[in-house]
């Protein structure tokens, strides 16, 4: 269930209090693997049974309406997941695993044919990716990957299936090989701020930074962009990110969820269940802990106790210049009304009445002022709930945005310096310090 708070400055709540027993929002989609054992184990130990898969699907229905898998063949999971997902009310995004061997593609293709023949492949299938990070792993070239995808797409079209088909890979592959963008039906990118060594407070912001250019490309090409893998680990140690904790996983999800919801972003959380078999298979400890659920299908407590509230989008207009406070590439500027979707995002902010933060939609960073003097710098910085430089209060009677920590100072613009955004001593009836908070739809 989603909770909405239609107030002017609605709070986004991140509470780990133990007062709830389930995640109160639904994810767009979740990645799933029916594996439970390492590569070398016999199928009885390596693969979940039909009843175990069905149990998983019922658990996932509580947090999403879509599930995404990576292979038709591995653990025979397509044949098990498709009926189990339908029973649970879940749509399925299928995956075909690719390697440097075209013979393996033919095996997956043969399984695809049998799924169509049996009727398991029906309108409940909403997407199909051919390959997952195969180019990134340097097993095949981009052109080979496109060839594989075209082969599968041509086949399903010949069978009367219009399912959109794509290639899933890390975002840099899409940047390095633009021909992939033209070839796919929609863009499917994997992006993990976690592996890039950023502080969790900037995890969602880093994700936005990394995908911004491909979002622009997708809009220009009139194609959807799906974030096919995104997530954060709750345990283990990574040299770049440090110690992973349940609290940090919950923090990243909460921040990212708000970002995705505000932009109607399609994404698949990585991953559904913790998977100790990945460590047995030779992976790092952190790789076992990306799940929402434990391996026994119980929801992890950091998700179970997480309550996410609704944040209303707002625009901030200066009365003196009649321009809008805007953020681009971590910098502030004042802009006029625009029909460009990217500029509209830059002009949109979220007020958090609990933390007193003002967070940008386009960058997921907070309005920050660290120089308490006239002309002091105001910028955006990674949001930290207890950071005094990020505390603001809006005085509706005067239209002033007052700094809650640096008493006597207000958000100000200087027309003589190109409407520079700055901190300045609060003064009465100053149009450069008068701000109107409005719904972006009313700009």
Residue ranges and their predicted role:
Residues 1-22:
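Fungal secretory targeting signals
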Residues 192-196, 221-249, 273-275:
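Active-site clefts of carbohydrate-active enzymes
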Residues 28-31, 35, 40-45, 238-246, ...:
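Aromatic-rich peripheral "rim/lid" segments of glycoside hydrolase catalytic domains that contact
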Residues 156-175, 222-230, 266-277:
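Aromatic-lined carbohydrate-recognition surfaces of secreted/lumenal glycan-active proteins
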Residues 27-111, 115:
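N-terminal carbohydrate-binding/catalytic regions of secreted carbohydrate-active enzymes
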Residues 79-163:
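Substrate-binding cleft of extracellular glycoside hydrolase catalytic domains
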Residues 88, 94, 126, 132, ...:
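Aromatic- and acid-rich polysaccharide-binding/catalytic face
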Residues 310-443:
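Lectin-like carbohydrate-binding module/patch detector with strong preference for beta-trefoil
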């Amino acid at each position: 269930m989603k909770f909405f708070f239609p107030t002017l400055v609605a709070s986004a709540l991140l509470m780990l209090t133990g007062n709830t027993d389930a995640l109160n929002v639904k994810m767009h989609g979740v990645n799933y693997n029916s594996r439970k054992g390492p590569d070398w184990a016999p199928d009885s130990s390596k693969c979940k049974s039909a009843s175990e898969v069905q149990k998983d699907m019922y658990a996932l229905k509580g947090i999403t309406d879509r599930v995404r898998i990576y292979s038709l063949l591995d653990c025979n999971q397509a044949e098990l997941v498709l009926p189990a997902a339908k029973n649970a009310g879940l749509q399925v995004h299928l995956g075909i695993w690719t390697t440097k061997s075209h013979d393996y593609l033919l095996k997956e293709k043969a399984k695809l044919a049998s799924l169509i023949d049996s009727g398991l492949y029906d309108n409940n299938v909403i997407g199909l990716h051919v390959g997952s990070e195969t180019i990134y792993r340097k097993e095949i070239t981009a052109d080979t990957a496109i060839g594989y995808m075209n082969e599968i797409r041509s086949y399903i079209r010949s069978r009367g299936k219009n399912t959109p088909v794509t290639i899933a890979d890390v975002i840099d592959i899409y940047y390095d090989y633009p021909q992939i963008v033209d070839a796919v039906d929609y863009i499917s990118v994997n992006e993990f701020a976690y592996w890039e060594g950023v502080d969790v407070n900037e995890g969602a912001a880093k994700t936005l930074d990394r995908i911004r250019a491909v979002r622009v490309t997708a809009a220009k090409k009139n194609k959807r962009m799906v974030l096919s893998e995104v997530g954060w680990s709750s345990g283990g140690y990574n040299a770049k990110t440090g110690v992973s904790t349940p609290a940090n996983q919950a923090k990243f999800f909460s921040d990212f969820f708000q970002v995705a919801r505000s932009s109607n972003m399609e994404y698949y959380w990585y991953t559904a269940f913790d998977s100790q078999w990945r460590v047995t298979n030779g992976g790092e400890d952190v790789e076992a802990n990306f799940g929402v659920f434990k391996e026994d299908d119980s929801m992890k407590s950091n998700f179970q106790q997480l309550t996410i509230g609704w944040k209303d989008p707002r625009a901030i207009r200066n009365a003196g210049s009649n321009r809008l406070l805007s953020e681009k590439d971590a910098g502030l500027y004042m802009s006029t009304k625009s029909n460009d979707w990217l500029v509209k995002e830059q002009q949109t902010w979220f007020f958090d009445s609990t933390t007193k933060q003002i967070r940008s939609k386009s960058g997921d960073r907070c309005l920050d002022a660290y120089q308490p003097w006239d002309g002091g710098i105001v910028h955006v910085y990674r949001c930290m709930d207890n950071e005094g430089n990020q505390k603001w209060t809006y005085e509706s009677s005067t239209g002033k945005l007052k700094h809650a920590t640096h008493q006597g100072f207000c958000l100000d613009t200087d027309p003589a310096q190109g409407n520079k955004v700055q901190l300045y001593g609060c003064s009465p009836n100053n149009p450069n310090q008068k701000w109107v908070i409005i719904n972006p739809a009313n700009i």
